[in-house]
Regions:
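Bacterial N-terminal signal peptides that target proteins for export
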Residues: 1-3
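Residue-level signal for alpha-helical transmembrane segments in multi-pass membrane proteins
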Residues: 5-11, 128-131
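Residue-level signal for mature regions of secreted extracellular proteins and peptides
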Residues: 6-7, 47, 113-116
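Post-cleavage N-terminal segment of exported redox proteins
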Residues: 8-104, 160, 193-204
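Extracytoplasmic electron-transfer domains, predominantly the class I c-type cytochrome c fold
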Residues: 20-21, 25-37, 41, 88-92, ...
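Short coil/linker segments at helix-helix boundaries
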Residues: 75, 103-116
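Non-cytosolic head/periplasmic domains of membrane-anchored proteins
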Residues: 97, 107-109, 126
């Protein structure tokens, strides 16, 4: 039997709700909140297997088996540009790294007003002369200077941007490619922004 959100909340108030009940309450409220969802929007509201593992664990440590499963699923999700080029144009990547555009929900419909951005600067320090930067993630200043721009580094960088969980399961890094927020071509531009010697990121 599936209960509506009010009934679930009332039941939960009688005793402290267990995690399963709390999850059911949250999922029911979210699903009932959108009266005219599109299939694309409904899909965005569903957690995939990796997200369910990470949400269930919370602040606890993953077991080796759980970590291995998340990594395996993440690696299987990675797709590469049709052109085969993992390094695009650093200038385009610069724009993407500072652009926070994304999908918008209007009247229950998921709409895209413009091409999505990556907004990397929200969590990372990028060019050394920038002031408004984030510190949630590690600094990326001098990324290419420290690592070089070999094919191996380009591939590693591409995959970490596409789905960081392939290397750090359940990390806070958004899975920009796996969630289709960015296209493979856009991610290739971000790779160039990080490793191209001419990029502001790699200026001394």
């Amino acid at each position: 039997m599936v209960l509506g959100a009010p009934a679930l909340i009332a039941a939960g108030c009688a005793t402290f709700p267990d995690p399963a009940t709390t999850r059911q309450i949250a999922e029911t409220m979210v699903s009932e909140d959108f009266t005219a969802p599109t299939p694309a929007l409904l899909k965005r509201l569903e957690q995939d297997r990796s997200q369910r593992i990470c949400s269930r664990i919370g602040d606890a440590k993953l077991t080796q088996e759980e970590a291995a499963e998340v990594v395996q699923l993440a690696r299987a999700s990675i797709q590469y540009p049709a052109s085969g080029r993992l390094v695009g144009d650093w200038k385009t990547g610069n724009t993407l790294a500072h652009d926070g555009a994304g999908d918008r929900i209007q009247g229950g419909r998921l709409e895209q007003r413009k091409e999505n951005g990556g907004l990397c600067q929200n969590c990372h320090a990028l060019a050394p002369d920038e002031i408004n930067v984030g510190n949630v993630g590690p600094s990326l200043t001098g990324y290419g200077l420290q690592r070089g721009n070999s094919e191996a580094i380009a591939k590693l960088t591409y995959e970490r941007i596409y789905n960081a969980w392939a290397y750090a399961p359940c990390s806070n890094m958004p899975r920009l490619g796996a969630t289709r927020h960015l296209t493979p071509e856009q991610i290739a531009h971000l790779v160039a922004f990080l490793i191209d010697p001419a990029s502001p990121v790699n200026k001394r």
